[in-house]
Amino acid sequence: MIEAAVDRGIREMQEEPKRSVRKLADLGRQFSRGRFQKNFFDLSQTLLQDDNSPYYTILSRLTRETNHETLKKFGVNIGYTSWTYGASLIRSYEKEHGYDVPWTVFMHYLPDGPLGLKQIGGLIEEGRSIGIYTYFIYLEEMPEDWTELTELFHSFDNSAFLLFLPDRELEDGDADLLSGCRNLLVSAEIASCYRENIRLLKQRGCIVANHYYYYSSDPEEITRQVKDCDSPLLLFIARDDCMPEDRRRVADAVYDIRYHPEFPVFPVELHSDFRRVDQIISGRTCLLEVEANRKVSLPDGSFLSALDPDMTLAGLLRKISGQTVCGEYA
């Protein structure tokens, strides 16, 4: 039923984007039940009041450039399975067990590194059982063979994955494998190879994004990156050496650009906006990021000891409970 409604919505967006999107936003606000949906549709109504809003261009590009099955699958997986069904499981689990659960997990994958796909798959399997259906995976290096990684995405068909590519060229065959994963968004780092990588992925109907690693809060640089972006979604990610005050300034700047758009790009400051979603779902925030060496990264730059290969996700969440990683959103 949900997928049929999404199919109809995609068709209508192709034919009459402005009218269909407004209709969806109005209906969504009227019938939304969950915390996240109410916030999302309130925002959508506000942003789409302007007939010349660049967000109409974004939606038109998405329906024109993206495989519709991929758009539907990824959209349902993150919009319903993660932010509605999964969010309900997370709230119930937090109430029962007394510690915070994030709505997503960040994992760094290095082929042949300590954090292997078997352990990643185990964390995902357990995460889904407590409501975590979205996963961010940073590739530290391009794998020689993409088969195992894409099989991981296929094996969790109703989860949503966001894959961050390093600055290395994709091969045609690699892009073919990635395009077969309907539950996947692929982001190319803004560096020397990203335009060619985005071209290959767009040719195959993938949902694409760009990500940019920043170390300062230069407003002109932020605007330039948004203006020059080749994708409808641009993710700003702070470098490890970026100062906290610069991160806050970038988060504020991105938030302002999003509410007063000039270009057909939706900008996101990854960690601050991740926390906004978590705050809506749980009323608190919790960040879980596992490095390729199996250490757990904390927001203050410190690390927990290396993740034991046999440690469960529940055990890890209990271990970080009370650390600076979790708490009220500010």
Model-derived regions, located:
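Core AdoMet radical
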Residues: T104-L117, G127-E144, F156-N197, L201-D218, ...
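Conserved C-terminal portion of the radical SAM core fold
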Residues: Y109, T134-Y138, C193-G283, E289-V296
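Conserved nucleotide-cofactor-binding alpha/beta core module
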Residues: T147-E148
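Accessory C-terminal segments flanking Radical SAM cores
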Residues: M1-Q45, V254, R258-A330
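Alpha-helix N-cap and loop-to-helix initiation/capping positions
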Residues: L115, Q119-G122, R249
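Short, flexible, glycine/charge-rich loop motifs used to bind or transfer phosphoryl groups or to couple energy/partner
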Residues: K95-E96, L152, D174
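N-terminal [4Fe-4S]-dependent radical SAM core
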Residues: G34-M107, S129
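Generic structural signal for hydrophobic
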Residues: L123-G127, F153, L177-L178, L201, ...
